[in-house]
């Protein structure tokens, strides 16, 4: 179970469904590498607890992405999805991904340093090219700081 998992009564959950081309490879990446607990599945889809949110991976052709999103000095893949973690959990996940040999689109780094909304970020793709961003904040109160 993810370290950020909370009881279902505490908040609403986000659901995202997207395509992958191999459910076994998806189980290895989302389950073994990211540490997401598997939920229901059939022979054409599988659900995961993605850090207390539901993702549904369906067999099909993944969306095409391109580095068209400008954030600071970087072009990031669009579209992408991701999550926000507290900084200690973010650092632990970054170390886990590095130990697993995940190739980063944008390696773990700080952005907006010293500014409101200072955050740590990393971008990587699942084995099917679906881009994922994970942000880390010292305090979740800073997520919408401007």
Regions found by a protein language model. Give the residues of each.
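Non-catalytic surface loops within mature trypsin-like serine protease
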Residues: 22, 52, 59-61, 85-87, ...
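Vicinal oxygen chelate
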Residues: 1-9, 12-20, 49, 69-146
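Core segments of cupin and vicinal oxygen chelate
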Residues: 19-62
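A short local loop/turn or secondary-structure capping micro-motif enriched for an aromatic residue
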Residues: 56-57, 63-67, 140-143
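Short beta-strand/turn micro-motifs at beta-sheet edges
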Residues: 2-5, 66-71
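A generic structural micro-feature
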Residues: 8, 40, 72-75, 116
